[in-house]
Amino acid sequence: MKKVFLLGLSMFCLLLLNAQTQTIRGKVVDKETRQALANVSVKITTATADSLLSATADANGEYAIAGVSVGRHNLLITLQGYKEVVLQNIIVSSAKEVILNIEMEEMVMEIGTARIVAKSKQTEPNNENALVSARLFTVDETDRFAGSRGDPARMASNFAGVQGADDSRNDIVVRGNSPQGVLWRLEGIDIPNPNHFAIAGTSGGPISIINNKMLGNSDFFTGAFPAEYGNSVAGAFDLKMRSGNNTKTEFSTQLGLFGWDLMAEGPFSKKSKSSFLVTYRYSTLAIFNALNINLGTDAVPRYQDLSFKMNFPLGKKGNLSFFGIGGNSNIDIIISNQKESSTELYGDDDRDQYFKSRMGTAGSVFTWNLNKKSYLNAVVAVSNQNINSMHQLVFRHAIDSFIRPSGQKAYRYENDSIIKNLRYTFKTSTIGTNLFINTKL
């Protein structure tokens, strides 16, 4: 029976190896006007058999290259009257199609002698007002850089002038500035600290709520911020969400140290160009604990997060999308149920500790082409953050008459914001006292 199983598994693997191809597709638009560009040439330049593969964008600016082998590939995008665009190290996997939406910049030439040099757009930021101290990063880099773990903050610690913390948190020091001065933005809106087990007033945490599989090309700033980043004094992450596959429904799952990921994307209907993209993650350690697997401690971190984006093209005139991200986390370090004090890996041996945190952001992006030279982009979003920490002191071997009540403080922090320039903030704080006595005579 064992030999039959191994033989069947080997045949299944051979079948998979014979079908390792995928499709690269997307849309090409003008960087300034957001208008679709037709007759754009998209060619694979990797020195393999795939170098013969290419495609031409249709009247809607859409292109598709089928039969691309699995691996890393380079793309060259050209159109007469526009600057060349070079995309390097594009990862193609057999699990899902690769969607690349490309922006091309018009090339202006004066009459006379002209020298044209092809320039890679790999690190040029999306924000046209960013002249220095800004860098574009891709989804691939959040996985490929050393110690990134799919986290944009940990990835940024590999850049010049950026120093990361220890492995327990993803706080970053940018050019000597405090990590508290780092700003997080999503789709053009400031958002609260997007990390599980976040501490009030900080910008980092042990585990990021952001799933890098949801991100498109995004910007990271280390200084000389444009005026729109007015609340940043150290660094800024300007994150963009990608749209889901609008022609094919795809599902994927991944189990790792930091969680079990489930992701789905596809079109709402075959006739529509609208699409959805949603991902959910749950704590791996919490799953192991539910299966009665001994983790060496009862203080198991539990967390989960959800991200989504729904995209609805409005023809050639504009686009409407809805996005959201949120997560909650909690951990309880309880020692009061022990007869004698013991040393836990985390926490103190004289108190029970309860910690909860959650954050969420949901909004909408509306883009409307006013004419061939201008467009309107409006973003509306609502954000919320709640952090609750509670400590309960435990007294052992005590005499009741000599016990003086003292003990726990509960801290609560909330932050609600509406729209980018019209902001409403609500903050509350509570302090309470509680006493737990474990008397042993």
Would you name each region that the model predicts?
Residues A19-T113, K119:
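Periplasm-facing N-terminal accessory domains of Gram-negative outer-membrane beta-barrel systems
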Residues D58, K83, I90-I99, T113-F225, ...:
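Periplasmic N-terminal accessory/gating domains of Gram-negative outer-membrane beta-barrel systems
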Residues G67, A165-D166, Y229, Q254-G256, ...:
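Short sequence motifs at beta-strands and strand-loop junctions characteristic
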Residues T297, N319-N369, N384-K427:
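Flexible loop and strand-edge segments within Gram-negative outer membrane beta-barrel domains
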Residues K121, P179, I191, R242, ...:
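Structural signature of outer-membrane beta-barrel domains
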Residues G204-S208, G216-P226, G235-G266, F276-Y282, ...:
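Short strand-turn segments of transmembrane beta-barrel domains in outer membranes
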Residues Q180-V182, M214, T247-F251, S272-F276, ...:
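Outer-envelope beta-barrel architecture signal
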Residues T23, G256-Y282, L295-I333, Y354-V382:
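Transmembrane beta-barrel wall of Gram-negative outer-membrane proteins
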